[in-house]
């Protein structure tokens, strides 16, 4: 099909290293999409690339091959991918074809998986009418930078969602200026988004601030950055960002929030969590506290604060993430209430939260979440394997297999086999006694600047033949994230021409 078809070198004899159709490719703004679904839209999309830092790149090539033999790789954390034997994976020794890898070898993965792409409902978020009382020069600037009218499908809107979420937590307005407070590396990321919108962010400022908590006084360096352009402030205000003292404000989530896709809601929430949610931390050697957000509101706007928390909980529920009931109680300050919302702390729920939503504009929390999610995945994978063995042992023992034979059959503690065979198990097994604590795992894990982590291959098995696909990216790193694995992109170089067949024949 010369109008709508895709380039398919595999169909004409090239040996293309490829991935199975359901392999999720990471896309910008926290999205993911099965590689086969990129066929008709790859030229309009960008793929996330694991360069020195994560970045995104245009996609220059999409390949589709006929059925080829594929193998399933599973890691010690339970992450899987299906690929042809010649597909290269990132390892400590560089890109290595799958056929050159074996159980126990190390590959690199990125723990964050994002949310499935959905095409947003298209509607006008802000129009020129919303600014009819503003200076005409301000309106002209916004129109010139394609910020008015602002549509729900605009890339600029995605950036504004992040800025609005973060500013609601750690921002302030001073006169016409918009201020953000964060660590320097996080302010740099905010500056990039502001610059992409056509505004000019300031340099990063620093000053020493003295604080007192529970009678203990300490000094810390506060970093900030401002945007003097009045247009950004007016846009953020109209997007629902509170003005003035937040404790006295009746702000809730924006009225259009429910019309957004999950991945768009996650942009706002993850930025707000980067500012306001507690960092991943453990309550015991292997179990985590529930990450939580807290707010103080004056009593007369406490209901608005509870509605804000309830909206967040509802949005997270739609992403498969469960929360604890909202807590609301008197704060120490007169006429002030404190509201608190936490993420349920069971391992599977935390994995979903850290890997689908997580934190934006906060590198330290993001780094901790990256290690935490891999630790929890490994822990859950070990527990699931132990539960499977316990079930098999109980069944075999009931069928008459001697326990001595079972202890020989399974590479696991004899006491575990005996208890499973004789007593059964009423609940899930615990991790084995030698399983590392999170602190030990954190210290031993080499987290790279792009937040990819090394993980061991647990198994590689042949799974049959199926159609396979690949991408070629424009970035010099020539890789992308597939089911979280850092894999090489298609190495074929192609030239497209407008010459017809008759032109070539002469």
Residue ranges of model-derived segments:
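Intein-associated homing endonuclease modules of the LAGLIDADG/DOD-type, together
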Residues: 41, 61-88, 92-334, 457-489
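Short alpha-helical "recognition helix" segments of helix-turn-helix
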Residues: 402-410
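Long, continuous compositionally biased terminal/linker segments
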Residues: 219-238, 335-374
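Long, charge-dense accessory insertions within large macromolecular proteins
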Residues: 19-60, 415-417, 438-452
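Basic, alpha-helical nucleic-acid-binding regions used in initiation and control of genome expression
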Residues: 370, 374-378, 382, 391, ...
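Hydrophobic N-terminal alpha-helices or hydrophobic patches in metabolic proteins across all domains
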Residues: 1-18, 490-506
């Amino acid at each position: 099909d010369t109008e709508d078809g895709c380039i398919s070198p595999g169909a004409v004899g090239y040996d293309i290293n490829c991935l199975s159709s359901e392999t999720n490719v990471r896309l910008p703004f926290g999205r993911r999409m099965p590689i086969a679904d990129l066929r008709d839209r790859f030229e309009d999309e960008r793929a996330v690339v694991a360069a020195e830092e994560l970045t995104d790149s245009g996609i220059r090539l999409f390949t589709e091959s006929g059925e080829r033999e594929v193998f399933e790789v599973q890691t010690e954390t339970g992450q899987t991918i299906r690929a042809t034997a010649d597909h290269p994976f990132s390892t400590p020794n560089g890109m290595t074809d799958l056929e050159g890898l074996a159980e126990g070898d190390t590959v690199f993965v990125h723990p964050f998986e994002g949310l499935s792409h959905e095409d947003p409902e298209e509607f006008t978020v802000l129009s020129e009418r919303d600014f009819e009382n503003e200076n005409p020069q301000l309106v002209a600037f916004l129109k010139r930078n394609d910020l008015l009218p602002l549509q729900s499908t605009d890339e600029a809107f995605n950036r504004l969602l992040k800025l609005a979420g973060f500013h609601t937590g750690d921002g302030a307005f001073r006169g016409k200026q918009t201020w953000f407070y964060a660590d320097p590396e996080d302010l740099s990321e905010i500056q990039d988004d502001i610059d992409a919108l056509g505004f000019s962010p300031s340099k990063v400022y620093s000053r020493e601030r003295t604080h007192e908590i529970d009678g203990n006084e300490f000094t810390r360096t506060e970093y900030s950055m401002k945007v003097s352009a009045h247009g950004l402030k007016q846009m953020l205000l109209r997007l629902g960002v509170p003005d003035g003292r937040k404790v006295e404000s009746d702000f809730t989530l924006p009225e259009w929030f429910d019309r957004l896709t999950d991945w768009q809601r996650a942009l706002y929430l993850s930025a707000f969590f980067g500012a306001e949610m507690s960092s991943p931390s453990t309550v015991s050697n292997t179990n985590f506290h529930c990450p939580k957000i807290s707010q103080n509101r004056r009593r007369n706007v406490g209901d608005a604060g509870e509605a804000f928390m309830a909206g967040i909980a509802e949005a997270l529920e739609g992403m498969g993430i469960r929360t604890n009931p909202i807590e609301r109680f008197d704060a120490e300050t007169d006429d002030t209430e404190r509201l608190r919302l936490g993420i349920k702390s069971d391992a599977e729920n935390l994995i979903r939260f850290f890997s689908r939503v997580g934190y934006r504009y906060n590198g330290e929390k993001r780094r901790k979440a990256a290690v935490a999610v891999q630790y929890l995945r490994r822990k859950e994978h070990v527990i699931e394997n132990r539960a499977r063995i316990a079930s098999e042992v109980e069944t075999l023992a009931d069928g008459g297999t001697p326990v001595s034979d079972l202890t020989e059959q399974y590479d696991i503690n004899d006491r575990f086999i005996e208890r499973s065979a004789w007593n059964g198990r009423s609940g899930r097994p615990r991790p084995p006694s030698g399983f590392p604590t999170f602190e030990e795992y954190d210290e031993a894990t080499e987290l790279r600047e792009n937040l990819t982590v090394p993980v061991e291959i647990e198994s590689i098995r042949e799974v049959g033949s199926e159609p396979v696909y690949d991408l070629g990216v424009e970035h010099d790193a020539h890789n992308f994230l597939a089911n979280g694995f850092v894999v090489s992109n298609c190495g074929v170089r192609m030239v497209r021409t407008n010459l017809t067949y008759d032109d070539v024949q002469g």
